[in-house]
């Protein structure tokens, strides 16, 4: 009986362990997807494309699974919260402009995380590379 109980306990622990490893792997790959979208946005430097890159990064990350979706939300929320403080300092935007843009960014983030096509936000003329 003790052997049976021990085997059950070990299998449960190992099962939970593998789920966490999968989650963290998805989160890591999702963070890389977010970084790739950010890097592409900086490289493209295309006016009006930021919402597309927000949606694309979140979409790609969420496709990895729950860990990727979690990473996308954490990174997106952190980015928006940081910008809330840095934009007035470095860009001179007023709080109304910053809040409006932040809400639009968060809508694009959620659009992508929910599995909807990020091309909805793709501006005309953005090179096919992106």
Swiss-Prot record:
Region span, Disordered: 86-130
Q: Which disease is it linked to?
A: Reactive, secondary amyloidosis is characterized by the extracellular accumulation in various tissues of the SAA protein. These deposits are highly insoluble and resistant to proteolysis; they disrupt tissue structure and compromise function.
Family, per entry: Belongs to the SAA family.
Instruction: Write out the GO cellular component annotations.
Output: high-density lipoprotein particle
What does this protein's UniProt record list under function?
Major acute phase reactant. Apolipoprotein of the HDL complex.
Q: What positions belong to coiled-coil segments? A: none
* Alphabetized UniProt keyword annotations: Acute phase, Amyloid, HDL, Pyrrolidone carboxylic acid, Secreted, Signal
| Gene symbol of the encoding locus | SAA1
Gene Ontology BP, a term: acute-phase response
Induction summary: Upon cytokine stimulation.
Modification Pyrrolidone carboxylic acid occurs at: 19
Cysteine disulfide links:
none
Query: What does the PTM comment state?
Result: This protein is the precursor of amyloid protein A, which is formed by the removal of residues from the C-terminal end.
Task: Check the UniProt entry and state the signal peptide residues, or none.
Answer: 1-18
Name the source organism: Bos taurus
Q: Output this protein's name.
A: Serum amyloid A protein
Please give the tissue specificity annotation from the record for this chain.
Answer: Expressed by the liver; secreted in plasma.
Q: Where in the cell is it found?
A: Secreted
